[in-house]
């Protein structure tokens, strides 16, 4: 399974992904983080093309790891809906898009992505305002989360 956590910088995507792996003992999971992908592939381009390239690299890596029977959690802004939707269509029921958001600015306002496109269909919604990380994890894995 691939869990694709998308949302603005500072919304809690990486915190949530790391907690899932560490606190819930999902040791066989692989975590792909947007900052790590940028560092690994030396992509410092924050233009639309640079962001799309970063997302594509993460998608390719997630698909590869999934093909090797790894569960993957991706924490990445991935601002463009069309790109996320195409990957969801390609992966079918093997991917769950999770929109992580907050109304708080958490020290990353300089990284705010003006053209971020929120999901509108077939996604799980997690608002990290006034909620503990464990509560977010429980919500994420709840069968009733839509």
Predicted features along the sequence, with ranges:
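Hydrophobic anchor at the beta1->P-loop junction of P-loop NTPases
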Residues: 5
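Conserved beta-strand scaffold positions in the cores of enzyme catalytic domains, especially
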Residues: 29-31, 95-99, 123-125
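P-loop (Walker A) phosphate-binding loop of NTP-binding proteins
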Residues: 8
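Small-molecule kinase domains that catalyze NTP-dependent phosphoryl transfer to phosphate-bearing small molecules
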Residues: 100-146
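ATP-binding Walker
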Residues: 11
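ATP-dependent NMP and nucleoside kinases share a basic, alpha-helical "lid"
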Residues: 40, 44-45, 62-72, 76-119
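Walker A (P-loop) ATP-phosphate-binding motif of ABC ATPase nucleotide-binding domains
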Residues: 2
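Conserved substrate/cofactor phosphate-moiety recognition/catalytic segment
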Residues: 14-63, 67
């Amino acid at each position: 399974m691939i869990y694709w956590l998308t949302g603005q910088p500072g919304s809690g995507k990486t915190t949530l992904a790391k907690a899932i792996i560490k606190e819930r003992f999902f040791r066989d999971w692989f975590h792909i983080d947007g900052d790590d992908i940028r560092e690994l592939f030396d992509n410092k381009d924050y233009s639309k093309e640079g962001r799309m390239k970063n997302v594509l690299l993460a998608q390719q890596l997630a698909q590869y790891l999934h093909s090797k029977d790894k569960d993957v959690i991706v924490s990445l802004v991935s601002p463009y809906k069309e790109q996320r939707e195409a990957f969801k269509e390609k992966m079918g029921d093997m991917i769950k898009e999770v929109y992580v958001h907050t109304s708080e600015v958490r020290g990353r306002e300089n990284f705010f992505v003006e053209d971020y496109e929120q999901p509108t269909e077939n996604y799980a919604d997690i608002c990290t305002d006034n909620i503990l990380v464990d509560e977010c994890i429980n919500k994420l894995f709840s069968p009733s989360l839509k």
